[in-house]
């Protein structure tokens, strides 16, 4: 069952196409609004309405591939889906719905074949340059099916150093923004934000960017040091000692485990979730975090 704004998103998307718009739309949805549920509902409706439809769901990390595929199965247990990801050691071809990593399929248009709809999660990572991986794959798929349509999804429809992702040269032509953070907070779907200044500062000098984002291996090397991790954990303890739950977004798998170890050493009940965490264990950890049994939860590209 979709929330009202999730169904509104799908309705506005269909209206966009019904209006005869040219180009490709980008859906802007706040973090925590449930993009994966919307994608699952959209794919299910498309396949059930037009059974011959072939959909390719792209993203940049295997954790999101796995997460999106799981949400699809939760929403539609018998979904005809496959996964194409070198990191997950899966190369499924031929299912109506394929979840794939862009690095694994950027040169595989001939193998993928005819696709009607491409969905791109975290689409702000799509380069405005024609030679980028996403652009190359879409160009190749368009040669196979000139009627191909692309839908992007992101919470941040802009790129540092370039501007909005609809600014030329751009893959996306319009932004559909069906719901605001303020509405989600008002309806209690999101908690109100209370930000605090920190005394600890981190230098990212020397950390390079790729596609407008920091290169994960370099960022993790910069932040995952004993001194930095200890300082951050101690500051969290001092600033958030009265809060029931602490959620940490870390720079990589190793970083997430190291922060969790420091929290445990400080006497804080903690756990860590990464892409390789088995589903049953992940569900147990999240349930414990929601109940308050686990106070601190670290993760890398999962939550």
Residue ranges and their predicted role:
Residues 1-28:
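Conserved pre-motif I regulatory segment
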Residues 20-33, 38-67, 144-145:
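Conserved SF1/SF2 helicase motif Ia
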Residues 53-61, 245-252, 273:
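Conserved RecA-like ASCE P-loop NTPase motor core of nucleic-acid helicases/translocases
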Residues 62-86:
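Conserved helix-turn-beta segment of the N-terminal RecA-like "Helicase ATP-binding" lobe
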Residues 82-93, 257-261, 268-302:
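Conserved helicase ATPase core of P-loop NTP-dependent helicases/translocases
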Residues 87-117, 128:
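Conserved helix/coil segment N-terminal to the catalytic DExD/H
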Residues 125-195:
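Post-DEXD/H (motif II) to motif III coupling segment of the RecA-like Helicase ATP-binding lobe
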Residues 173-250:
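Conserved interdomain linker/interface between the two RecA-like ATPase lobes of SF2 helicase motors
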